[in-house]
């Protein structure tokens, strides 16, 4: 009798196991040279010789490490989306992402962002759900000058994209919130100072997202690594460690490691978690290269063991979990701060602003004596340090710019990605559609708005990658081309319902074969929200109702 040999484990490109040979084009690109080195070529060659001089491997690969993607060529609908059409879809202009770690900016930095937009980006500026600012229509010839101006106010595009540590999310009210367990600003600044733009973590298997906050206002459950404020019964204020979150086409919620980390050790523990990902993360398939897949295969117990024994060389302290929140904390409206002054949070529709608006906000801040503004993980902005006597004038000035501190349910709770306007991956219009959808919903649902005592979030994404977090929205829309009923296709969306973070965190319920066209979004939202109001129990949240609702009420 012959005994079968055990199958040989497949090479997943894990460095710690000796698998260093590149297994795909992206890994080959990184092995050929540190992507960060492309900055010198941008400054000394491409900016001087123009777009046509750019090497394709730099253009479609290494430029990402400096926050640069080519934007979508105008005039191509969703039927053109896909790698086969990249040469047609690739415009000679760039999206530039400016990282704003912790979302924190001075008035001077905000003014500089506004000036860059009006001078170099055709007055475009969008606040992303990762506290970044994104420009469009950037020409490579202007990139060095933009970098110089950003550097003058302490901002950068370094590793804003690419297989590296992206912007670190932080609380918009860090250091000033009356509800925070502690202020982790030091840890965010220290991580950026020690590790961003350095070779240690410039070659990770895939993107790597971090959130650090003294309260639960950074969507920590969908980050690769997160530290969330919690009080330990013996050791006092510290942070609870989470790992393995992420959405896209295979969404997973982060899991608690079960460890309490004192503030002073956060940068060290962050670097250790990042090192585990760098060394053990899967590099064979891009679609399975995020940390969440390693966590899924290993489990938390093994991950913690490797983290402690191989990297930290010491055990972590066991700690309690923070109590989950019922609703997103978006900091919209007026809030009292620790320093006795006020914060004013406003809601541009789907994060869309402009250089003109950002400059005008900087002017309003100057008149109110404020030098601090924060972007939020929900595409909002918050101005800090406003005295009571100047509050009404500031709010009136913001209202005049279309930035409402008392927004409707729909203006406050709708998010969208860049969409087909600029993104080469998108099948559908999203952010532009949102500008029309919000006023439509405000008008159509005016008669029942007073009955909505819970938020209903609406997230619109142009493709399956979920930059706008469709799976954790009450109502999520995933862009795709759908059958128009006449043998052709039209821009539309797959519907996800009932996603939620915090208490009862989970992903949306995808309705079988239910899709809506872009033109039908208002009709669909009107219908399902009215069904919710009609059939909900007292105090029931939308996500709770969706679980038990009849499918006909969700269509």
Curated annotation (Swiss-Prot):
Keywords recorded for this protein, A-Z: 4Fe-4S, Heme, Iron, Iron-sulfur, Metal-binding, Oxidoreductase, Thioether bond
Other comment: Was identified as a high-confidence drug target.
Enzyme Commission number, as recorded: 1.8.7.1
Keyword presence, Oxidoreductase: yes
3'-(S-cysteinyl)-tyrosine (Tyr-Cys), cross-linked positions: 69-161
Protein's name in the database: Sulfite reductase [ferredoxin]
Function: Catalyzes the reduction of sulfite to sulfide, a step in the biosynthesis of sulfur-containing amino acids and cofactors.
Recorded family membership: Belongs to the nitrite and sulfite reductase 4Fe-4S domain family.
Residues annotated to bind [4Fe-4S] cluster: 417, 423, 463, 467
One matching Pfam family: NIR_SIR
An example molecular function term from Gene Ontology annotations: sulfite reductase (ferredoxin) activity
Requisite cofactors: siroheme; [4Fe-4S] cluster
Keyword Ribonucleoprotein on entry: no
Main EC class the enzyme belongs to: oxidoreductase
Cofactor note: Binds 1 siroheme per subunit. Binds 1 [4Fe-4S] cluster per subunit.
Native organism: Mycobacterium tuberculosis (strain ATCC 25618 / H37Rv)
Catalytic activity: hydrogen sulfide + 6 oxidized [2Fe-2S]-[ferredoxin] + 3 H2O = sulfite + 6 reduced [2Fe-2S]-[ferredoxin] + 7 H(+)
């Amino acid at each position: 009798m012959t005994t079968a040999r055990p199958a040989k484990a497949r090479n997943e490109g894990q460095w710690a196991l000796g698998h260093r040979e590149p297994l795909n084009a992206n890994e080959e690109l990184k092995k050929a040279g540190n992507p960060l080195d492309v900055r010198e070529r941008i400054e000394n060659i491409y900016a001087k010789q123009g777009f046509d001089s750019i090497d394709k491997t730099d253009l479609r690969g290494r430029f990402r490490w400096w926050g640069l993607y080519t934007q979508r060529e105008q005039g191509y609908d969703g039927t053109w989306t896909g790698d086969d059409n990249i040469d047609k879809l690739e415009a000679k202009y760039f999206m530039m992402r400016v990282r704003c770690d912790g979302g924190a900016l001075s008035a001077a930095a905000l003014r500089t962002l506004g000036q860059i937009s009006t001078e170099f980006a055709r007055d475009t500026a969008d606040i992303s759900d990762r506290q970044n600012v994104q420009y469009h229509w950037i020409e490579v010839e202007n990139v060095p000058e933009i970098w110089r101006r950003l550097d003058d106010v302490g901002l950068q595009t370094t590793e804003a994209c690419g297989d590296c540590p992206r912007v670190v999310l932080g609380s918009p009210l860090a250091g000033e919130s009356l509800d925070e367990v502690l202020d982790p600003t030091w840890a965010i600044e220290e991580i950026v100072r020690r590790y961003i733009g350095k070779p240690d973590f410039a070659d990770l298997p895939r993107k790597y997202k971090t959130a650090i906050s003294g309260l639960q206002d950074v969507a920590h459950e969908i980050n690769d690594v997160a530290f969330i404020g919690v009080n330990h019964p013996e050791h006092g204020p510290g942070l609870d460690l989470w790992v393995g979150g992420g959405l896209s086409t295979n969404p997973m919620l982060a899991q608690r490691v079960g460890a309490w980390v004192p503030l002073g050790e956060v940068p060290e523990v962050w670097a250790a978690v990042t090192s585990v990902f760098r060394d053990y993360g899967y590099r064979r398939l891009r679609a399975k290269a995020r940390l969440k897949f390693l966590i899924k295969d290993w489990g938390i117990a093994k991950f913690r063991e490797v983290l402690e024994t191989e990297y930290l060389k010491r055990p972590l302290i066991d700690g309690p979990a923070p109590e989950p929140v019922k609703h997103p904390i978006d900091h919209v409206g007026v809030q009292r701060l620790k320093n006795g002054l006020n914060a004013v949070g406003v809601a541009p529709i789907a994060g869309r602003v402009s250089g003109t608006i950002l400059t005008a906000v900087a002017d309003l801040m100057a008149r109110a004596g404020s030098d601090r503004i924060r972007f939020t993980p929900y595409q909002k902005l918050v101005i800090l340090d406003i005295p009571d006597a100047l509050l009404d004038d500031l709010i009136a000035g913001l209202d005049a710019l279309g930035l409402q501190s008392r927004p409707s349910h729909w203006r406050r709770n709708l998010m969208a990605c860049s969409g087909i306007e600029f993104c080469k991956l998108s099948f559908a219009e999203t952010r532009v559609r949102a500008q029309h959808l919000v006023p439509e919903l405000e008008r159509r649902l005016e008669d029942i708005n007073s009955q909505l005592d819970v938020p209903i979030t609406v997230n619109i994404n142009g493709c399956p990658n979920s930059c706008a977090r469709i799976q954790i929205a009450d109502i999520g829309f995933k862009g795709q081309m759908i059958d128009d009923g006449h043998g052709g296709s039209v821009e539309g969306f797959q519907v996800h319902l009932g996603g939620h973070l915090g208490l009862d965190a989970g992903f949306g319920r995808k309705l079988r074969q239910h899709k809506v066209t872009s033109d039908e979004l208002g009709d669909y939202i009107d219908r399902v929200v009215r069904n919710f109001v009609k059939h909900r129990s007292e105090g029931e949240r939308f996500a709770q109702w969706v679980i038990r609702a009849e499918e006909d009420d969700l269509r």
